[in-house]
């Protein structure tokens, strides 16, 4: 922050020296050098800024989503349009959001793109606070992070990403009304509008306004039909609301947009498979579950769902048991998966093992009626009928 205060006073050399000193501290190198690169941009030295980014790129660390936009705009100032496009496409891949797609389209059209990521010492200070919030997301409490993002927005009002992070933090704190208002503050004309609307739809759903949430997503589908993430998000919401046929249609559209299936795509096949299953289209669901496992063989959600479903159907029981055991190994404290294991053991006649695991599942999920009912069935099978009646 002091470095950016010095930048605001025009003491560029002193500021750069401070950023260098900060970069030598443990765990601060990438963060401090990013600030130094932005400082170079503020004074128009894009060559020096790109030197920092190119070195960071070699190490494979330190470039964030916002940092990727910064670098692309630096390359544009250096009249390296092709390099900017190649970098964005490689960094974001086929799952690039509307903000990145819009920038690539501008680059391909030859539009003049100014460097507008940092335009003053104040905005640079806002970048520091926003960067700290990003870096500390998995450690510090959301209240503290929200202070950083709100201050970042105050110092750098044009930093829409700080506003989006504030909305996300408010949502995670359960302040859905404030989160919706924050998402709604992103201008429709801004390339990040789609991300904001996706966030608003999720917040509306959690706020109990499901129909409004679906309407927001339907409008996005109409306006941005080529964005796979919108169709997948709509599919998830429709599936959660029990509208399985509509969910499958949304998932179908999203899957058709995948050029090459990769491990990260396991979820959408799993989600479509569960929707097929709820529609009693088991063969279609099974195909999706097995394909999801081919993409990510140790994905515990798929292993548990498929294993439990096979047990319920009385099919491939030993294989189903093996799947659930692998899921438990990945998530040893997940009560619902331990319940699946105990139930599979019960169905296979391994009653002693079933009792141990069902009791453990009830410890973890004491109020769940299905788990308690399963334990009752297991107790009955081993002759503990009084305890079984109590569980039922």
Show which residues each predicted segment covers:
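Position-specific recognition of the canonical hydrophobic site in helix A of tetratricopeptide repeat
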Residues: 7, 41, 76, 137, ...
């Amino acid at each position: 922050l002091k470095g950016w205060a010095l930048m605001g006073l025009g003491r560029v050399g002193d500021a750069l020296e401070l950023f260098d000193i900060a970069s030598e501290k443990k765990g601060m190198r990438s963060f401090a050098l990013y600030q130094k690169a932005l400082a170079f941009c503020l004074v128009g030295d894009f060559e020096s800024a790109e030197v920092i980014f190119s070195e960071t790129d070699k190490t494979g660390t330190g470039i964030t989503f916002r940092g990727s936009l910064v670098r692309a705009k630096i390359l544009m100032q250096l009249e390296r349009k092709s390099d900017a496009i190649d970098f964005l496409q490689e960094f974001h891949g086929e799952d690039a959001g509307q903000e990145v797609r819009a920038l690539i389209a501008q680059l391909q059209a030859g539009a003049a793109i100014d460097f507008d990521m940092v335009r003053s010492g104040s905005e640079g200070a806002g970048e520091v606070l926003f960067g700290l919030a990003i870096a500390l997301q998995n450690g510090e409490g959301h209240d503290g992070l929200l202070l950083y993002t709100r201050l970042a927005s105050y110092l750098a009002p044009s930093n829409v990403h700080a506003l989006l992070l504030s909305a996300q933090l408010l949502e995670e704190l359960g302040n859905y009304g404030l989160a919706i208002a924050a998402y709604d503050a992103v201008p429709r004309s801004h390339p990040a509008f789609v991300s904001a609307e996706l966030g608003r739809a999720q917040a509306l759903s959690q706020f109990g306004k499901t129909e409004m949430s679906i309407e927001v997503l339907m409008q996005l589908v109409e306006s941005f039909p080529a964005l796979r993430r919108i169709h997948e998000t709509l599919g998830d919401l429709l599936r959660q609301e029990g509208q399985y046929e509509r969910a499958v249609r949304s998932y179908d559209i999203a899957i058709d947009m995948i050029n090459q299936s990769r491990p990260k795509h396991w979820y959408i096949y799993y989600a479509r498979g569960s929707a097929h299953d709820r529609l009693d289209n088991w063969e279609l669901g099974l195909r999706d579950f097995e394909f999801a496992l081919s993409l990510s063989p140790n994905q515990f959600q798929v292993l548990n769902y498929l294993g439990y479903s096979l047990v319920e159907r009385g099919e491939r029981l030993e294989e189903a048991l093996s799947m659930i055991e692998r899921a438990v190994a990945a998530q040893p404290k997940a009560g619902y998966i331990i319940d699946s294991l105990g139930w599979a053991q019960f169905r296979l006649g391994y009653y002693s093992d079933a009792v141990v695991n069902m009791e453990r599942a009830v410890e973890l999920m004491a109020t769940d009626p299905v788990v308690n009912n399963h334990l009752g069935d297991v107790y009955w099978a081993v002759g503990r009928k009084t305890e079984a009646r109590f569980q039922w």
